[in-house]
């Protein structure tokens, strides 16, 4: 695999109904470029991976360890491994960038869909 890829060329994986992630895996981390359809709830879940992220488009209400906050473009979040969390996209949906350590092995086997540009910018070359 090339070390250089456009986000739009990464193969999307269906993580939940209404949630597509374009994962990029390295040896110790996974970065996910995630699109959440308008109003979709990412149900409460937990994983051993640490997770940090930011909102790139739209808005999302994150609930982390029972605390909720609406996040907008440019705002960040941090979730320790094992902590329960959920998210609900705003009326226009959301695109977030998530970084996980260690690698999200479960995302490697998630069902995929054919790549398409989606909501991520095309390279400007």
Model-identified regions with their sequence ranges:
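Conserved short histidine dyad/triad with adjacent acidic residue
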Residues: 15-17, 32-46
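A short, N-terminal "cap"/entry segment at the start of jelly-roll beta-barrel domains
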Residues: 1-28, 109-125
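Ligand-binding loop in jelly-roll beta-barrel domains
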Residues: 81-106
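Short acidic-glycine-tyrosine-enriched beta hairpin
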Residues: 66-81
């Amino acid at each position: 695999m090339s070390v250089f890829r456009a986000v739009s060329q990464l193969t999307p994986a269906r993580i939940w109904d209404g949630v597509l992630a374009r994962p990029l895996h390295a040896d110790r981390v996974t970065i996910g470029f995630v699109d959440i359809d308008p109003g979709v709830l990412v149900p409460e879940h937990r994983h051993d991976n640490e997770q940090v992220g930011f909102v790139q488009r739209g808005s999302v209400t994150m609930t982390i360890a029972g605390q909720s906050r609406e996040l907008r473009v440019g705002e960040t979040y941090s979730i320790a491994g094992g902590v329960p969390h959920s998210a609900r996209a705003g009326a226009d949906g959301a695109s977030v960038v998530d970084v996980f350590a260690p690698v999200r092995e479960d995302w490697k086997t998630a069902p995929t869909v054919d790549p398409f540009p989606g909501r991520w910018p095309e390279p400007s070359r």
